[in-house]
């Protein structure tokens, strides 16, 4: 049943109907549409459109319909209804007869769909926050188990300074904390109810919209009806949250793909998250991580697409806004799947400590320690930087590590260098000296793990 038609003398072309209908994707809003309809039925009692008995009949029928939807949501797709709103109304009329036709009094699909989508977004934010926290927990547990796994830290994908695998894990805990914070901020702004704003000018019935908002679990009601039915900022914000979150997951995936490569060989991934080659029997490919990295692009595309959809729209509602759902649903589904998959990747990962340490001892990652040593001896840092650069060139020429150079070799670059330099150049010393908050010293990493556990578990 179409919710309109009196104005038209011809039926819609079937091709237009298929082009126009949205049930194939907005069926996902069925629960929210029913919940909103129950609240609206209560509001209609307060203005005399429904009596208490009628409202009870509607609510009972809607409750039964909600149970049916929860049991088999995909059954909705067998209908030829235009959208989820017309599907719910048709099913309601089937259950209660003409009484069901009274429910839409004073309500438009414009405020109805805006309400449904916000309710769905609120639930989805909770799901995403839970998944973010679960990944953070997996990272913290992996960090705790690998505090002694020394590995190279990189800049420009070149070995820079030694870090630990635990410190690497904790870096992503911080990124995910910002992701969770962004979701919480988004929730604060979307937590206002548009229901009761009608098509664009507000409802003609003196409904207490603040009370209605409370029944639906919103913090308050919106303040302007034109804005309320036009607003899709929450869609853009959630797509932005997802885009940033997927960038973080893509970087996480890229790091582990490199760490797992034969060239680095820092970690082994579980067989449960890898696959083989149809031709090369020796291959063990990091497909889970590559798919996380690859799916980042589709989420970025959804954000760009929605931004372009909205940028030229006049107030108030336009059919263009129907395009808000498919990209949002796909982007948030993708982000949620990738969060779960990233946690699964960490479950069973093996850090190859000897290889990590070997790599950390190569590439002159202790060069900064020699510069700091010279500064402690009174050499200005810029001069010390130049001296160490020359020493590295000599070490490369001899094919040795800095700490393997003879004292006489080092002293040709600076006479202040003494025997006490060698303990400074030791790998563990490089870590131990990073004692400021956020550093890679064992004490700071242990403290960061303890703080994260207190916050996340």
UniProtKB/Swiss-Prot annotation:
Q: Which GO terms describe its biological process?
A: arginine biosynthetic process via ornithine; L-arginine biosynthetic process
State a single Pfam family of this protein: Lyase_1
Any one annotated GO CC term: cytosol
The pathway noted for it is: Amino-acid biosynthesis; L-arginine biosynthesis; L-arginine from L-ornithine and carbamoyl phosphate: step 3/3
Q: What class of enzyme is it?
A: lyase
Q: Where does it live in the cell?
A: Cytoplasm
Please indicate if the UniProt record lists Lipid metabolism as a keyword.
no
Grouped into one coarse class, the protein's main location is cytoplasm
The organism's place on the tree of life at top rank: Bacteria
Report the catalytic activity: 2-(N(omega)-L-arginino)succinate = fumarate + L-arginine
What Enzyme Commission number does this protein have? 4.3.2.1
Q: Which UniProt keywords apply?
A: Amino-acid biosynthesis, Arginine biosynthesis, Cytoplasm, Lyase
Task: Give the molecular function GO annotations.
Answer: argininosuccinate lyase activity
Q: Record's family?
A: Belongs to the lyase 1 family. Argininosuccinate lyase subfamily.
Q: What is this protein called?
A: Argininosuccinate lyase
Q: Which organism is it from?
A: Yersinia pestis
Q: What is the taxonomic lineage of the source species?
A: Bacteria, Pseudomonadati, Pseudomonadota, Gammaproteobacteria, Enterobacterales
* Gene assigned in the entry: argH
